């Protein structure tokens, strides 16, 4: 990139390219409470020197990697003491007010949904620690014509943790940093920070401190397209997770723990418990469900096509023997397929009337509901949810096919999806939406969000199995074509919110649902317009993928396990923890890479896949639990100052919660990748 550097006043520098100020930076240094006055700035080629009162100075080496500017910032401290380091970044936005986007943290002012999470409604000004973002201090300012993207290298020690704040024309980074006016600590806690003192960083005389700053500033009216360009330009600067478990071992451990969660009902059928061993909050997990948060029908589909895995692995052999004895089944190569059949039969009870399916079951009371877990709205238990129905019915279609390949015909597993399809064909809204929450009589109570995209994916899998001359085939096909413009418009408008059921906010799963739907539709229709929309959904997913290894205390549980945040995904604006959803995203990113001939999505898929092979309980590292939990992998990886249940002791480097969906999603994705030959054989 052809650019020049120009000083502005005593403490600033502008980066100019093609006559445009693409970045404007100012640097400040505080000693104790005093602002050290800048003594002047000198530009020597691609090197910037900024001197401060008292002899300290900042040295910035500037290099460009094509469109990406990289500034290596080194502060030199003349005397011992406590310092605060600040810099600001802006650009010539022609006085236009910018939209602010912070990856995995701030999207469209966080005005979608309800909850305690930070939003413009609560305050117009915020400061966040770098560990809350998928790239440290990552932010984008965009005015409809221009996008300024920037981030920093991660802190290597607690005293260097930075925070970032902004206004509509620029951003300020402070080292060390603090959060204000509130700190979001859990789903129900937004802690006031009024009484805190500004932190400082102690430096010895003649010592140095170095951080890197990354900037991509470009003419672009598409915010997410520009951010993706930023990530691509920085790929060589990013970390890759360290692999600690082979793919063969991953499959063995996942299957072992999944089988340990299987129980038998009084009728002899099988179900999957939601989670175990979760201490003071275990009561929250006394459920089972065919779909969301348990994914039991998807687990059945995985069992139905699982090859005979044991490799002499004693914990798995023990679980197979337990299943064989519990259900009086031969312990042979059909054991898991027969178990899958018993599981499929169990969840058929969720059909309350023809096509009306409520698959969440309270194991203590036996009550069935649309969703019985944690949520902002207890009335969900009385309703029917399109995400739950779409997930479960797609899995029933796949389960039916997988069992049929083994000579096991379970007609009920296809008949139920057909009745549910009829329900949604009849209820589909005039704009093409499949809605979100429905009454048992088919009346919509909530139509917001992306839950209906799961019905779209379900229809894509059901359609090829229907008689092309049948009325249902015609209706499903027609409903599908009416849905595509509606959900395509959600992508175009960036309406990625309201997908997860245990919170109400912008979330990554909204984009995952839309990506899957449009890839499924593209597989049916081979229409490039559908692929273009899938790519746009994928761009939003990229914003939730951690690209660098955030700071973790070496003394924390995550630090002791040498956990890497790179390649992990965070959940939503309302959930500030990391999870292992990346295995499922990887399956779709590999599809997207194949369809679009873009290897970037393939590389990103493998980054997520490798990240998901860590923090799995083994005999040597049981993750704080006993032998019966071999293979468990926590749902909540609390890398920052947040914990689902507001428990301070489990923030900043802790992990918690055994929940079925983590194992189901990971194992099913593992089998899919294995079947596709996408798992490197030497790992």
Task: Name what the model sees in each region.
Residues 203, 221-292, 318-321, 325-326, ...:
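Low-complexity, Ser/Thr/Pro/Gly-enriched N-terminal "stalk/linker" regions
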Residues 267-289, 357-386, 433-454, 494-519, ...:
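Carbohydrate-binding/catalytic loop surfaces
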Residues 226-261, 312-350, 405-427, 469-488, ...:
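Extended, well-ordered alpha-helical scaffold segments
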Residues 297-334, 391-409, 454-472, 513-528, ...:
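Well-ordered alpha-helical scaffold segments within catalytic/enzyme domains
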Residues 199-224:
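Short Pro-Gly-centered flexible turn/kink motifs
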Residues 471, 480-502, 525, 529-655, ...:
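Non-catalytic carbohydrate-binding regions of carbohydrate-active enzymes
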Residues 370-383, 394-474, 523, 535-545:
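Active-site lining segments of carbohydrate-active enzymes
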Residues 28-55, 60-205:
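Beta-strand/loop-rich accessory regions of lumenal/periplasmic or secreted enzymes
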């Amino acid at each position: 990139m052809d650019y020049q550097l120009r000083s502005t006043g005593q403490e600033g520098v502008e980066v100019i390219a093609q006559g445009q100020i693409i970045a404007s930076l100012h640097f400040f240094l505080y000693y104790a409470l005093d602002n050290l006055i800048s003594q002047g700035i000198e530009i020597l080629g691609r090197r910037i020197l900024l001197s401060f009162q008292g002899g300290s100075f900042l040295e910035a080496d500037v290099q460009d990697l094509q469109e990406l500017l990289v500034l290596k910032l080194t502060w030199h401290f003349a005397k011992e003491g406590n310092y605060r380091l600040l810099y600001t970044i802006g650009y010539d936005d022609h006085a236009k007010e910018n939209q602010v986007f912070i990856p995995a943290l701030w999207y469209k002012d966080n005005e979608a949904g309800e909850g305690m999470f930070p939003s413009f409604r609560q305050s117009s000004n915020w400061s966040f620690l770098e560990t809350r973002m998928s790239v440290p201090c990552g932010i984008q300012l965009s005015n409809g014509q221009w996008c300024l993207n920037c981030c920093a290298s991660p802190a290597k020690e607690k005293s260097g943790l930075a925070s970032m704040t902004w206004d509509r024309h620029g951003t300020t980074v402070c080292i060390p940093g603090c959060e204000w006016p509130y700190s979001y600590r859990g789903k129900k806690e937004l802690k006031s920070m009024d009484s805190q003192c500004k932190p400082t960083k102690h430096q010895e005389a003649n010592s140095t401190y170095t951080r890197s700053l990354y900037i991509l500033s470009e003419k672009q009216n598409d915010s997410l397209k520009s951010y993706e360009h930023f990530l691509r330009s920085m790929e060589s600067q990013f970390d890759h997770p360290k692999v600690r478990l082979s793919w063969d071992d991953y499959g063995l451990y996942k299957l072992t723990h999944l089988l340990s969660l299987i129980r038998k009902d009084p009728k002899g059928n099988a179900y999957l418990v939601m989670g175990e061993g979760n201490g003071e909050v275990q009561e929250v997990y006394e459920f089972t469900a065919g779909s969301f948060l348990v994914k039991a029908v998807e687990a059945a589909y995985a069992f139905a096509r699982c090859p005979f895995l044991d490799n002499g692995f004693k914990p798995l052999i023990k679980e197979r023997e337990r299943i064989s004895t519990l259900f009086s089944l031969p312990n042979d190569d059909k054991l898991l397929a027969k178990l899958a059949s018993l599981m499929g039969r169990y969840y058929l009870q969720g059909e309350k009337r023809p096509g009306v399916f409520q698959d969440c079951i309270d194991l203590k009371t036996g009550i069935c509901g649309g969703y019985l877990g944690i949520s902002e709205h207890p009335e969900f238990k009385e309703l029917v949810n399109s995400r739950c129905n779409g997930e479960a019915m797609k899995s029933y279609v796949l389960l039916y096919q997988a069992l049929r390949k083994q000579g096991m015909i379970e007609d009920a597993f296809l008949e139920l999806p057909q009745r549910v399809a009829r329900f949604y064909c009849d209820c589909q809204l005039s704009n093409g939406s499949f809605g979100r929450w429905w009454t048992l009589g088919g009346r919509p109570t909530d139509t917001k969000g992306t839950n209906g995209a799961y019905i779209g994916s379900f229809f894509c899998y059901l359609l090829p199995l229907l008689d092309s001359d049948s009325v249902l085939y015609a209706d499903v096909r027609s409903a599908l074509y009416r849905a595509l413009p509606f959900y395509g418009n959600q992508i175009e408008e960036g309406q990625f919110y309201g997908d997860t059921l245990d919170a109400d906010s912008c979330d990554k799963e909204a984009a995952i649902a839309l990506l899957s739907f449009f890839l499924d539709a593209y597989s049916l229709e081979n229409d490039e317009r559908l692929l273009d929309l899938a790519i746009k959904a994928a761009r939003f997913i990229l914003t939730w993928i951690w690209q660098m290894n955030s700071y973790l205390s070496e003394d924390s549980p995550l630090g002791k396990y040498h956990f890497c945040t790179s390649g992990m995904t965070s959940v939503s604006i309302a959930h500030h923890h990391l999870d292992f959803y990346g295995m499922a995203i990887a399956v779709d990113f590999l599809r997207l890479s194949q369809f679009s001939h873009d290897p970037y999505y393939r590389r990103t898929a493998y980054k997520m896949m490798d990240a998901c092979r860590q923090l799995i309980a083994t005999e040597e590292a049981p993750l704080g639990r006993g032998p019966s939990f071999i293979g468990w992998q926590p749902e909540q990886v609390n890398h920052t100052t947040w914990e689902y249940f507001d428990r301070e002791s489990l923030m900043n480097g802790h992990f918690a919660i055994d929940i079925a969906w983590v194992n189901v999603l990971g194992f099913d994705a593992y089998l899919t990748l294995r079947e596709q030959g996408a798992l490197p054989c030497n790992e």
